[in-house]
Amino acid sequence: MAVQKNKKSRSKRGMRRSHDSLSTPQLSVDSTSGELHLRHNVTADGFYRGQKVINK
């Protein structure tokens, strides 16, 4: 098992943990259907930026 030789400071611990935070997903409203969707993703209806891109 790995054991550290010297104690890590609070500053170094904080620097390591600075990338661990979670961010909320960026949502957009489609101009055609008014549906919420993730940014840069096609809606469930097949619309992207107001245009139909997927035909079911």
UniProtKB/Swiss-Prot annotation:
GO terms for biological process: translation. SUPFAM superfamilies: Zn-binding ribosomal proteins. HAMAP family: Ribosomal_bL32. It comes from Shewanella sediminis (strain HAW-EB3). PANTHER family: 50S RIBOSOMAL PROTEIN L32, LARGE RIBOSOMAL SUBUNIT PROTEIN BL32. It comes from the Bacteria. Keywords: Ribonucleoprotein, Ribosomal protein. One of its GO terms (molecular function) is structural constituent of ribosome. Residues 21-34 have a biased composition (Polar residues). This is Large ribosomal subunit protein bL32. Residues 1-16 have a biased composition (Basic residues). GO terms for cellular component: large ribosomal subunit. Belongs to the bacterial ribosomal protein bL32 family. Residues 1-36 are annotated as: Disordered.
